[in-house]
């Protein structure tokens, strides 16, 4: 289970009064927690490729976003692919590799199909209400300050749909003998 973009606002990392994270805090007590994990590159795509391959961006030659890793590294075995190759179910729910937000919400983006046993691409009302995104450069969402004050419940948003699906999958996996 990997989560990103949390900053140190979660309770288990010191917290912030506005962030209520009891479930993440409980998970952190039971699992591994990386407190000195640093970004390998100041862009999303190279950092994510580095995390999944174990290679520095200068080794992989992935220095920009919107790169399919197999074009640069056709024979690389990613972390999730290694688990999959050793009998684990490696399921991706939402974004792991780079994709443009909000444009690519609900599709594979720049994913690596060889890395996964199963995938799920959630698409919530935050995608269908894309026109409501405020951006300092209208219509440009990456590389500029932009946000959406989304209406609706958590379960209607892309992240809420992903969290609900993850819970369902974890319950399903717990009933099998296959590691996940």
Question: What residues fall within each predicted segment?
Answer:
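Formylglycine-dependent sulfatase
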Residues: 1-180
């Amino acid at each position: 289970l990997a989560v990103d973009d949390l900053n140190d606002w979660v309770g288990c990392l010191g917290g912030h009064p506005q962030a209520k994270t009891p479930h993440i805090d409980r998970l952190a007590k039971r699992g591994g927690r990386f407190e000195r994990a640093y970004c390998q590159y100041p862009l999303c795509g190279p950092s994510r490729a580095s995390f999944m391959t174990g290679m520095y961006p200068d080794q992989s030659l992935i220095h920009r976003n919107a790169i399919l890793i197999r074009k640069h590294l056709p024979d690389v075995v990613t972390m999730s692919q290694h688990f999959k190759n050793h009998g684990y179910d490696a399921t991706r729910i939402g974004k792991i590799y780079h994709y443009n937000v909000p444009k690519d919400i609900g599709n594979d983006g720049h994913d690596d199909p060889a890395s996964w046993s199963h995938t799920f691409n959630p698409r919530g009302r935050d995608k269908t209400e894309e026109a409501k995104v405020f951006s300092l450069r209208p219509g440009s969402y990456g590389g500029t300050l932009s946000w959406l004050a989304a209406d609706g419940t958590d379960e209607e948003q892309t992240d809420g749909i992903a969290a609900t699906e993850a819970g369902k999958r974890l319950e399903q996996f717990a009933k099998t003998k296959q590691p996940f």
